[in-house]
């Protein structure tokens, strides 16, 4: 699903003609999304948003246009699949009753086992209730899964009263002080019969009063997931969704985007047949993967570094104007931000006013990078008080910092000297600005 987008990103980043590469990438993106059964209108809206942002926004200083474009694509694709919504997967209270619903063939019973294993690994005492009385093999399947993961299963194989079974199963596990109880309900209706499914869900809900209802959707239905997820979301405000079989279909993108469009929360995705192949769904992590995780993470890290650097520059301006004081914590933030932005030689070439440093020999730049690493290690061994007020760092503190950072006292002193030099330079700039303003005031009189 959407696998070709990784190659499209690499091709785009290595292209020489920027404008042509942008148009080619957008076409490739549209084709990939439509092939993944994402609604055409959603695809059209997505590409328009990308184009609008390209026109209205400018890349941060030191960020190449290509990288900025990919970061916009990453951002808008993440929104398509749910944005910054991080589902709460841990129970809000103990005991916690979960009711699973879904149409036949959605993988609901297997998902019940996967959920049980997920919570068991987190240290919870979990019980399963087999309340699917319409599919003959459902009870046996859940019992088999329970044995595999060592989780008890309550069921009444000769009884067809699903609500009664669910109620008695929940009561049994509650009396035995179980933390999480997962109820597997009947999935006898096919897609297109959502009304009957939701009616059954309401009846079961009123009897067992679960803390959460989770709808299980098969990814292979693609954008058809919209109707089912929409009605479920309206009927059950406490509900969330698990999208299964993401590994076995090209339509996973369509299913995820359709569910996200309803506003319903996707909690997990099933990524394989094994019981441990259940993943907490994070839209940004998902998009990172389909675009090529390494490429995207390095670009986003660089942009974050630049944003942090620009914030630090504002602090420097405040220091020069006398509104703030420079601390070692500020130096630490500045060096950390610079490291996120890439190799020192590239950073110096891209930052405004630093082009002159592009002629610095490679060996000296490497030494500079090594020094930055060492300074960061030293500052990591300092207390918050020392970072915020370096004047308190005496000989005994220097020895302690050197020992903690695996450096020498001389190297700690070198950092403190560098800090003092920077402080003096900023004070000098401040004095010069003050003198310039004084002359301006006198000349204007």
Curated annotation (Swiss-Prot):
Q: Which GO terms describe its molecular function?
A: 7S RNA binding; ATP hydrolysis activity; GTP binding; GTPase activity
Q: What is its main location?
A: cytoplasm
Q: What subcellular locations does the record give? A: Cytoplasm
| SMART domains in the cross-refs | AAA (SM00382), SRP54 (SM00962), SRP54_N (SM00963)
Enzyme class, first EC level, given as a word = hydrolase
Cellular component terms (Gene Ontology): signal recognition particle
Q: Which family does it belong to?
A: Belongs to the GTP-binding SRP family. SRP54 subfamily.
Q: What does this protein do?
A: Involved in targeting and insertion of nascent membrane proteins into the cytoplasmic membrane. Binds to the hydrophobic signal sequence of the ribosome-nascent chain (RNC) as it emerges from the ribosomes. The SRP-RNC complex is then targeted to the cytoplasmic membrane where it interacts with the SRP receptor FtsY.
Self-association and partners: Part of the signal recognition particle protein translocation system, which is composed of SRP and FtsY. Archaeal SRP consists of a 7S RNA molecule of 300 nucleotides and two protein subunits: SRP54 and SRP19.
Q: What is known of its domains?
A: Composed of three domains: the N-terminal N domain, which is responsible for interactions with the ribosome, the central G domain, which binds GTP, and the C-terminal M domain, which binds the RNA and the signal sequence of the RNC.
- The name on file for this protein is Signal recognition particle 54 kDa protein
Gene that produces this protein: srp54
């Amino acid at each position: 699903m959407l696998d070709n987008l990784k190659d499209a990103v690499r091709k785009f980043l290595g292209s020489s003609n920027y404008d042509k590469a942008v148009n080619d990438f957008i076409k490739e993106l549209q084709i990939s999304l439509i092939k993944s059964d994402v609604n055409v209108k959603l695809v059209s809206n997505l590409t328009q948003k990308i184009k609008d942002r390209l026109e209205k926004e400018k890349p941060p200083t030191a960020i190449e246009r290509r990288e900025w474009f990919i970061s916009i694509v990453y951002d808008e694709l993440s929104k398509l699949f749910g944005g910054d919504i991080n589902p709460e997967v841990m129970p809000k209270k103990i005991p916690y009753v979960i009711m699973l619903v879904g149409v036949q063939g959605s993988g609901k019973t297997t998902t019940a086992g996967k959920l049980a294993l997920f919570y068991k690994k987190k240290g919870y005492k979990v019980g399963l209730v087999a309340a699917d009385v319409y599919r003959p093999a459902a009870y046996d399947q859940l019992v088999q899964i329970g044995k595999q993961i060592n989780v008890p299963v309550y069921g009444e194989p000769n009884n067809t009263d699903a609500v009664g079974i669910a109620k008695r199963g929940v009561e049994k596990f509650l009396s035995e002080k179980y933390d999480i109880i997962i109820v597997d309900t009947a999935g006898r209706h096919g897609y297109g019969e959502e009304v009957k499914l939701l009616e059954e869900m309401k009846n079961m809900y009123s009897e067992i009063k679960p803390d959460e209802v989770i709808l299980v959707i098969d990814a292979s239905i693609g954008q058809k997931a919209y109707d089912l997820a929409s009605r479920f979301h309206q009927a059950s405000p406490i509900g969330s969704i698990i999208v299964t079989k993401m590994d076995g279909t090209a339509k996973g993108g369509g299913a995820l985007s359709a569910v996200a469009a309803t506003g319903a929360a996707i909690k997990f995705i099933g990524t394989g047949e094994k019981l441990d192949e259940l993943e907490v769904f994070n839209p940004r992590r998902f998009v990172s993967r389909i675009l090529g995780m390494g490429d995207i993470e390095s670009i986003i890290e660089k942009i974050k570094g630049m944003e942090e650097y620009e914030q630090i520059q504002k602090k420097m301006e405040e220091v020069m104007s006398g509104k703030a004081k420079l601390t070692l914590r500020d130096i630490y933030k500045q060096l950390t931000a610079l490291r996120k932005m890439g190799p020192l030689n590239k950073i110096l070439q891209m930052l405004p006013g630093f082009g002159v440093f592009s002629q610095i020999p490679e060996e000296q730049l490497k030494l500079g990078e090594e020094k930055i690493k060492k300074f960061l290690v030293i500052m990591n061994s300092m207390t918050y008080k020392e970072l915020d007020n370096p004047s308190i760092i005496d000989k005994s503190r220097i020895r302690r910092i050197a020992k903690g950072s695996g450096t020498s006292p001389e190297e700690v002193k070198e950092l403190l000297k560098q800090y003092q030099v920077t402080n003096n330079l900023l004070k000098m700039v401040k004095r010069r600005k003050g003198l310039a303003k004084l002359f301006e005031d006198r000349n204007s009189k």
